[in-house]
Amino acid sequence: MNNLIKSKLELLPTSPGCYIHKDKNGTIIYVGKAKNLRNRVRSYFRGSHDTKTEALVSEIVDFEFIVTESNIEALLLEINLIKENKPKYNIMLKDDKSYPFIKITNERYPRLIITRQVKKDGGLYFGPYPDVGAANEIKRLLDRIFPFRKCTNPPSKVCFYYHIGQCMAHTICKKDEAYFKSMAQEVSDFLKGQDNKIIDELKGKMAAAAQTMEFERAAEYRDLIQAIGTLRTKQRVMAKDLQNRDVFGYYVDKGWMCVQVFFVRQGKLIERDVNLFPYFNDPDEDFLTYVGQFYQEKSHLVPNEVLIPQDIDEEAVKALVDSKILKPQRGEKKQLVNLAIKNARVSLEQKFNLLEKSVEKTQGAIENLGRLLQIPTPVRIESFDNSNIMGTSPVSAMVVFVNGKPSKKDYRKYKIKTVVGPDDYASMREVIRRRYGRVQREALTPPDLIVIDGGQGQVHIAKQVIQEELGLDIPIAGLQKNDKHQTHELLFGDPLEVVELSRNSQEFFLLQRIQDEVHRFAITFHRQLRSKNSFSSQLDGIEGLGPKRKQNLMKHFKSLTKIKEASVDDIVEVGVPRAVAEAVQRKLNPQEAEALLQVAEERVDYQTEGNHNEP
């Protein structure tokens, strides 16, 4: 905790409000609310916390606060601040998950469409449905029963759907708007489960068609009746009152929260929404934040009722959702909330079980690898790979895996300094010497295993440096790739031998991940260096363009191509003098500069000729 934070903590009021944590760059990393700002904000800097809260606190270098009149006002402000600033430690609902709806458009001749956008446009919306497939299935059924307009713009002639009885052909139809409103009401009744009237009508039409020997038409009506029956069986009735409601339940454990929302429409459970995330405050308050974001961000209709658990502030939810808010005490609605809570608990337990299995697999992989190589369990593994193209911009990279997982803070990049040309062995010698010479000098923690991305030659070089030059005792293994550039063989021992390794084993998958990661890291560094060198070389020799201005150009435009495409004014905006900006454009676009020069010369010649003709 720095002196600025200590001073500000003394100034905190006991009022409700929002607090805003910032990192060293002034970026907002967390927004929270509190009934008592002094108690809540001070709690971050006192006592011990779990790992995720420690990670948050370690990044806080400043905070601000906003006092509000009430806790509900603080809740609304918090939701807006999160939406505006998108802090990395706050709950952020995914915007890409929107559910499909069936819509009857508000047009003179209405259409039946599927949409993911719910707008206040006078249209009738039904849903949400679990996926587009389910919505399409129902829409196809409705199209066969109700002849709504199919075309976006009514055609001048009757369309194909008119001939198969699925369109009224509005170009020749004499029906008034009241007729279509009536048909829309029938669709609404049907989607609410009130389909007995339609089934009776279809049965009557089927019987009439059979009496007149129109058996194909009768079969069509029969299929429609069966399709409605199938649709009924797919939707489980959860409530007898056939209300539209959202049912919320949540469960917390080990610093994580799971919220489940059941979408119950016309008494039937049609879909659920599941979200798992870490929480930093009181779970009830973080749940309220979630509900506020849910109805602010998610594209779906607010239902007639919202059911919430007992321990949630009902008035706070009412401020967030324009709907009837209930905390059921008993009966069918209470069972729905309990079911949502139970499912939230199951989802959270599944997450922890999967994490435990992942840890077990990773731990088992490094233990098996140790047994296979007859060395202590390699908790820390360091791996190296070189990268160059025909000896240009040679680099090397080191990745570190601790307990079988990447430790990216320990990754290192190396520019090759002493090697000229494409000499992979010499490059490996330099990098191993630099890395473990430093480990020796600074008494750093050595790895339990070194993995070289290469064959016998590279491994021998590494052994010479580690064992003979530096006198260190660190096991060294090599990973060879096959012709398809895939992990193929593990080399180990003295002399080096191929270690038999099952390709389906966890230890093989671990080594494969290590090899892929060090290759990716080395290649990425090499590309960055090549790009930077290319950038520098093409901008060398421009008077007034020093290293700092080159760096600013690259930071702003990201690539040489973007600078080539930029105008002189664009370059000037980065802080480059106009004369220098013009020189940059001439250097990067010589053909264009030559053409402009030629035009200028022709203009001068023309003016000169004109002067000669004067009397």
From Swiss-Prot:
It comes from the Bacteria. GO terms for cellular component: cytoplasm; excinuclease repair complex. Keywords: Cytoplasm, DNA damage, DNA excision, DNA repair, Excision nuclease, SOS response. GO terms for biological process: nucleotide-excision repair; SOS response. One of its GO terms (molecular function) is excinuclease ABC activity. The keyword DNA repair applies. Interacts with UvrB in an incision complex. The UvrABC repair system catalyzes the recognition and processing of DNA lesions. UvrC both incises the 5' and 3' sides of the lesion. The N-terminal half is responsible for the 3' incision and the C-terminal half is responsible for the 5' incision. NCBIfam families: uvrC. This is UvrABC system protein C. It comes from Streptococcus pneumoniae (strain Hungary19A-6). The gene is uvrC.
